């Protein structure tokens, strides 16, 4: 591998790091993953009717989950939602 290729690879990786690093430090991330508590409620794609809880930005709120799909802002109980999302 020539020196020009090595320098090009180093430059590319440096630019990639500079572009993505601020995103990793943003307020929407928690421990390296998107904070589930900021996601909107999502009923999912099926037509079942399961009582679930999501965090609406202030409190945990009940909603009807369809049973498949949706996102991670979905908890089986209000207590589980509050434990994960309520700020002390």
Curated annotation (Swiss-Prot):
It is found in: Secreted. Keywords: Disulfide bond, Protease inhibitor, Secreted, Serine protease inhibitor, Signal. Residues 28-33 form a propeptide. One of its GO terms (cellular component) is extracellular region. Its main location: secreted. Residues 37-85 form the BPTI/Kunitz inhibitor domain. Disulfide bonds join 37-85, 60-81. SMART domains: KU (SM00131). GO terms for biological process: envenomation resulting in negative regulation of voltage-gated potassium channel activity in another organism. This is Kunitz-type U15-theraphotoxin-Hhn1l. It comes from Cyriopagopus hainanus (Chinese bird spider).
């Amino acid at each position: 591998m020539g020196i020009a290729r090595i320098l090009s690879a180093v430059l590319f990786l440096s630019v990639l790091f500079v572009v993505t690093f601020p995103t990793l430090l943003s307020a929407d991330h928690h421990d390296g993953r998107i904070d589930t508590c900021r996601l909107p409620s999502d009923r999912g794609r099926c037509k079942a009717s399961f009582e679930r809880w999501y965090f609406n930005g202030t409190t945990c709120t009940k909603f009807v989950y369809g049973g498949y799909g949706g996102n991670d802002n979905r908890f089986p109980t209000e207590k589980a939602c509050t434990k994960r999302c309520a700020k002390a």
